[in-house]
Structure formats: C-alpha cells, structure tokens
Amino acid sequence: LLLPRSKNKSESALDIEINEGVTDVNAKWKEHWVDMPEYVQEENPSFRTIHMHFRTEQHYQDFAKRIGQELTEKTNAIWHPKLDITKNRFLRWVDDGFTFPLRHPMYIVSKGRADSMITSRSLSRMKIPHYIVVEPQDMQDYDKALDTFDIRQYVTLLEAPFSNHGDGPGRARNWAWDHSISIGATSHWVLDDNLADFYRLHNNERIRFESSTGFRVMEDFVDRYDNVYIAGPQYRFFIAPNQKYPPYVANTRIYSCLLIRNDCKHKWRGRYNEDTDICLRVMKDGDVCLQFNAFMQGKMATQTVSGGNTAEFYHAENTDAMKEGYNTDGTINKSQMLADMHPDVATVVWRYGRWHHHVNYNPFKKNKLKFKDNIHLSTGVNNYNMILDRNFQDPRFSK
C-alpha cells in the first residue's frame, strides 16, 4: 500500500532562488490582490515519489515498454500516468466582448532579428499596438518584415539615431524611454525581442492569454502604489504549475518585459545584465520592484536566437564557440560586471553548465508597498471580462 507522501514543513516554492526577496510584504498579498482577477494557486504534489534502480539496460528498456513511455540515459524523472505537456495548447484566456486597452505605450528594442520578430508577432496576434526601436541599417529589413508577417497594422517602427555602438541595449531603451515621455506617457513598457507568448497562472495551470488585458491588469495593480517604479511578469519556465506561489513578489529583479515609471531617476546603463542593475538601484533607494507570478512571459532561451545580444556581445567575445552554436563562456563578463557594480549583494557562480550572477535580495525586505493617496479599492474579484476559450484556433498550431 502506497500512502501519499508527507509534506515537509520546510518545503515551499517561495524558498527557491527565482523568488528570492520574498518577505512579509508578499505574505500579505491577499490584502493587496483585491479588485483583481481570481487567483488560486496551491501546492499540488505528486501522490508518491518512487526512486528506481535497474540492474541492466534491458531491464530499463523493459520497464519503459511496460509503462508506455520513452526513457533514455538522459531521463531523470517521469510522471505516471504520462504527463500531457500539450493539454493546454488550445486553451486561451480571451476577452468576453470588451478588451481593456493598455494605459502605457509598449516598446520592443530589436537588432538584427527582422527574420524572426518573435515578440512583435506575439503582440500583433493579440492586437496590441506597439513600437519597435531599430537601428538605421536595419530599417529596410524590418519594414519588409511587417508585410512578411502581416503585422504592419499593429507596429510603428522607430529609427534610433545611432548604430553598432557596442555598449549594450541600454542606449536604445533609454531612447525609447525619452520617446514615451515626448508623447506624454507617465510610464512605458520595454520588451526584449524574443518573447513568444504570455500566460496567466491560475488553478495550477499556465495558460496563454490572447489580448492586452493581461498587461492592463498589471498596469492597474502597479498604478495603485506610490513607490513601485519597475514591474513585470515572471518567466514561465520558472513557475512550476503544481507549486504554490503568491500572485506577485516584491523586492526582486524584473527581466525582459518591464513596466517602468517615467519619473524613475535611474536610467539604463552597462553592457550586460542591465535589467538586474537598474532594479537593484531602485531597491537601494527604498523603493519597490514588483514581479508578477499571476502573469508570465514565455522567453526563448538566452543565446539561442540569432542576432541581438547573441551576435554582438556573447559570441563576439569567444568567436571559436560560435562554431558550436552556444558559448558557455559568453555569460562570464555579463555576470562579473554586475558583481563589480554591486559587490555588496552580487557574486559570480557556476550553475547548470554556465556562469550566472547570484544576488542577495534580503537587504530589500524592508521596502514596503505604499498606496497612493486617495486610493479606494473595491473588494472582491474583478476578472476583467476574461473567459477561458477551450478551443482556441491558433494559426501556429494544428490539431
């Protein structure tokens, strides 16, 4: 008789590194997550974990046949019955008759990726108007790509007044920031150009959302506070659907998809890891950076999409590795620069076959969310007209 495994009291999804910075302010999330979409995300552990050892390769293959799953020497763990990783492919959070438009303009900074335009195609599919900042030598290619991918209706190309400067994407991001101020915006979104999809986390499911509403929810939540200067969604691959998470985490870094207040005094700088750097400077002022778990981004893996930083920075510093398609040394300078800029909280570590930075966010646990004056919130749930379409026809997939 197999009994359900007992839960270790010390186990918590909040203990893992991706949510470092979890503090009392996050433990009180239910006091803040009001007049927001319904959010239920509880731990849903396996019934039982069984560790198995096989005496021979033949025994291993016989076992694979008996359970009807493919097992190789690289297989570390499996679910039984077999986990259906495609079960949510045709599920989408869509709008029921009304779409909430964005309050703040959205920018993509892109270089040398007119042949993919991953983020722009995703936003256009969701019918979200946005800007793409490109360098002069790329303008013609990007303009042609708007017709190739049939996204011209939703895209405005902005030609940056510089090219091939080699000092990182910060210059283009600052230029987009200035552009947003020039059109009267009080905040702006700035996105990497390799974000394929965006997701809502609810009821232990990561399901794509298919309109601007998910971004609007994040905007509305952030706009309640006087001291949240940077916010954005968590990476999908850092959220395990069967673990417990709060809908947001305060006092941590935001990557790749950032909502930034235009009155933030800190601008982009540095050639590498500029996302973490700007967030650390904001938090060192006693202000808050807020990362959403309730809404997530699906990012292509670092250095796997040609163009952009992959060509200009990581591989350029170790050209021999370009022949192999991936440069394991490409992130060492990126990590070291952050450690040099923030030696009080950042160090360089080797993990998962490549160099990473490690940041201690504990010093920022004292940074509390502060409501703006005259904020009056309704109690209860506001689902923003989102409904679950169980048979969404995505042109990228076929049944």
Task: Please annotate each region the language model reported.
Residues 1-98:
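Compositionally biased, non-globular sequence tracts
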Residues 134-191, 196-210:
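Active-site-proximal specificity loops/subdomain of glycosyltransferases
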Residues 98-105, 114-115, 270, 276-399:
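C-terminal catalytic/acceptor-binding lobe
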Residues 102-130, 134, 138-146:
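Short, well-formed alpha-helical segments that are part of the catalytic scaffolds
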Residues 197-281, 309:
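Conserved catalytic core of nucleotide-sugar-dependent glycosyltransferases
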Residues 63-69, 119-124, 141-151, 246, ...:
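Short, aromatic/basic amphipathic alpha-helical patches
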Residues 57-59, 113-114, 194-196, 236-239, ...:
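Short, solvent-exposed loop/turn segments at secondary-structure junctions
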Residues 132, 187-191, 229-234, 289-293, ...:
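A structural signal for short, well-ordered beta-strand segments and their strand-loop junctions
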